[in-house]
Amino acid sequence: MLTRKQYELLRFINERLKESGIPPSFDEMKDALDLRSKSGIHRLITALEERGFIRRLANRARAIEVIKLPEPALGSGGRRGFTPSVIEGNLGKARGPASFDESGEQPVAVPVMGRIAAGTPIEALQTRSHTISVPPDMLGAGEHYALEVRGDSMVEAGILDGDMALIQRSENADTGDIVVALIDEEEATLKRFRRRGASIALEPANTAYEVRILPPNRVRIQGKLIGLYRKY
């Protein structure tokens, strides 16, 4: 599994390689991740190498090769080509009705309904706490809400602890969708949905967690993930 910082560093290295063909220096990595020392970068690099995401080439300065990326960057999720859109920026509360985003369109106020477990299921949350502003072209049709992600079971799908998950309200899902699943009317969790014969599989995107296989009468879909709102 990847921590938030490991994921951010891997993405930064990959983007720099795509742009220039040259890996970033340790100082550049340190600044990009807002770390105080290069020792933290050394630890992150070692962790990524041990997990098989990168490879350091011997006897060459700044020689790092990206071997693989988490699922969204590969576009290889259960629903082919599906990658949640990510808004990076300030997770402030919704602005007033006269506010507009950079494109000139009025943002949509999406209610935040609490927290959702990307790990061990937590109790279902029904309380609306506040709203966040989201670009309208990210939402599409239908009713939407947001949930703050807690846990790391979906990290290899690019969903990190602390992200705000943007959910399209729906009672149905296709195989490969990442959904908000209500289990036994008590526990809510964010997982990838698949049908396995007469059963439903709720799959994590982290090998440290197990797939849950449940009968349909124990699972109720409450929405599908359409995007992420991430604060840096």
UniProtKB/Swiss-Prot annotation:
GO terms for molecular function: DNA binding; serine-type endopeptidase activity. The keyword Glycoprotein does not apply. Keywords: Autocatalytic cleavage, DNA damage, DNA repair, DNA replication, DNA-binding, Hydrolase, Repressor, SOS response, Transcription, Transcription regulation. Its EC number is 3.4.21.88. It comes from the Bacteria. CDD domains: S24_LexA-like. It catalyses: Hydrolysis of Ala-|-Gly bond in repressor LexA. Gene3D superfamilies: Umud Fragment, subunit A, Winged helix-like DNA-binding domain superfamily/Winged helix DNA-binding domain. The active site is at S153 (for autocatalytic cleavage activity), K191 (for autocatalytic cleavage activity). Signal peptide: none annotated. GO terms for biological process: DNA repair; DNA replication; negative regulation of DNA-templated transcription; proteolysis; SOS response. The record marks A118, G119 as: Cleavage. It holds the Pfam family LexA_DNA_bind. Residues 26-46 bind DNA. PANTHER family: LEXA REPRESSOR (PTHR33516), LEXA REPRESSOR-RELATED (PTHR33516:SF2). Homodimer. Represses a number of genes involved in the response to DNA damage (SOS response), including recA and lexA. In the presence of single-stranded DNA, RecA interacts with LexA causing an autocatalytic cleavage which disrupts the DNA-binding part of LexA, leading to derepression of the SOS regulon and eventually DNA repair. This is LexA repressor. It comes from Afipia carboxidovorans (strain ATCC 49405 / DSM 1227 / KCTC 32145 / OM5).
